[in-house]
Amino acid sequence: MSSLIVKELDKSHVDKIVDVFCDAFYDYPVMRHVVGPAVEDYDQCLHTLIEFFVMARVYHQGPLLGVLDENTLIAAATMSRPDESSAPPELLEHRERVWHNLGVDARKRYESFGKAWSETPIIQPHLHLNMIGVRREHHGKGLARMLLDAVHEKSEEHPNSTGVSLSTENQKNVSLYEYFGYEITGQAKIAPGVETWS
């Protein structure tokens, strides 16, 4: 592996970011739960869902970061700014297309996460880390730490941000984030076997 760098990304990198996240989150509880157990083409549904998540950040002009190994994107992070405005029309239209494709039940399952996340709000303005993912073949190489450091720098640079928030649905990640200095502010059970920590 050559020298790695964290780079600011933009809309032109969406396909590569989605590709990284589809690999990193392939078996992630949120994705499996929202898409549903009986779907015929999980890979395509996962791509549709993750593309929506990434495009939401693009429509809001949120920060996008990536770790590149030469020209190959191997890890990425997407964020929300503390002063983010309401959803633009393009995002609302994209959202309706997504739920038309994934179905009413998938939408309800996703909204159950949104309800849980909204019940543990952080009052102070902050930068929110929406997604952070590393290709599975590159796990254990410190790439998440590189991205988290860059995310923290983004927060420090923003005049209205008092810190960084995130949520995880993988209990193994809780101790990892605590190691990086995060504190649990909320926990909720979404469905049998599916929990979220903020």
Question: Can you describe what each PLM-predicted range is?
Answer:
Residues R145, E157-N160, N170-Q187:
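Conserved active-site alpha-helix within GNAT-family acetyltransferase domains
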Residues L73-G133, H139, P192:
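Conserved acyl-donor/pantetheine-binding loop and adjacent beta-alpha core of acyl/acetyltransferases
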Residues M131-V134, G140-E153:
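Conserved acetyl-CoA-binding loop-helix of GNAT-fold acetyltransferases
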Residues N130-H139, S165-S175, A191-V194:
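Conserved beta-strand-loop-alpha-helix junction that forms the acyl-donor binding cleft
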